[in-house]
Amino acid sequence: MFLLHEYDIFWAFLIIASLIPILAFWISALLAPVREGPEKLSSYESGIEPMGGAWLQFRIRYYMFALVFVVFDVETVFLYPWAMSFDVLGISVFIEAFIFVLILVVGLVYAWRKGALEWS
């Protein structure tokens, strides 16, 4: 007897969910006209001609702040479900979550000591 028959709906959903975007891209590639020209290669900026060059330098500090923000944002995403079911999970999951937070705090202290969080 096939034991995975309970997942038939899941596999059907997965196949249909995969086929819809593939078919949409395929049909649009089949029906859309392909026109090469200078207008396709020009940049578009709110309907007006762009002024100046498109290459702007920005400080790497913005990147570091964004990276630290993403790390702690992902931490929040992982810790929220744990906090909602804290009373059911027990002490072992609490220790795992504590180790997870401790690793992130060590990373934050490392970034702080390296000067990654200094603005000037």
Swiss-Prot record:
Gene behind the chain: ndhC
Signal peptide segment: none
Keyword rRNA processing: no
Record key words, sorted: Chloroplast, Membrane, NAD, NADP, Plastid, Plastoquinone, Quinone, Thylakoid, Translocase, Transmembrane, Transmembrane helix, Transport
One Pfam family this sequence matches: Oxidored_q4
Function statement: NDH shuttles electrons from NAD(P)H:plastoquinone, via FMN and iron-sulfur (Fe-S) centers, to quinones in the photosynthetic chain and possibly in a chloroplast respiratory chain. The immediate electron acceptor for the enzyme in this species is believed to be plastoquinone. Couples the redox reaction to proton translocation, and thus conserves the redox energy in a proton gradient.
E.C. number: 7.1.1.-
Native species: Oryza sativa subsp. japonica (Rice)
Broad class of enzyme this protein falls into: translocase
Family: Belongs to the complex I subunit 3 family.
PANTHER family: NADH-UBIQUINONE OXIDOREDUCTASE CHAIN 3
Residues annotated as transmembrane: 9-29, 64-84, 88-108
Name of the protein: NAD(P)H-quinone oxidoreductase subunit 3, chloroplastic
Topological type in the membrane: Multi-pass membrane protein
Gene3D superfamilies (alphabetical): NADH:ubiquinone/plastoquinone oxidoreductase, chain 3
Principal location: plastid
Keyword NADP: yes
HAMAP family reported for this sequence: NDH1_NuoA
One GO MF term attached to the UniProt entry: NADH dehydrogenase (ubiquinone) activity
Location(s), subcellular: Plastid, Chloroplast thylakoid membrane
Cellular component, GO annotation: chloroplast thylakoid membrane; NADH dehydrogenase complex; plastid
One biological process term in Gene Ontology: photosynthesis, light reaction
Subunit-level organization: NDH is composed of at least 16 different subunits, 5 of which are encoded in the nucleus.
Reaction(s) the record says it catalyses: a plastoquinone + NADH + (n+1) H(+)(in) = a plastoquinol + NAD(+) + n H(+)(out); a plastoquinone + NADPH + (n+1) H(+)(in) = a plastoquinol + NADP(+) + n H(+)(out)
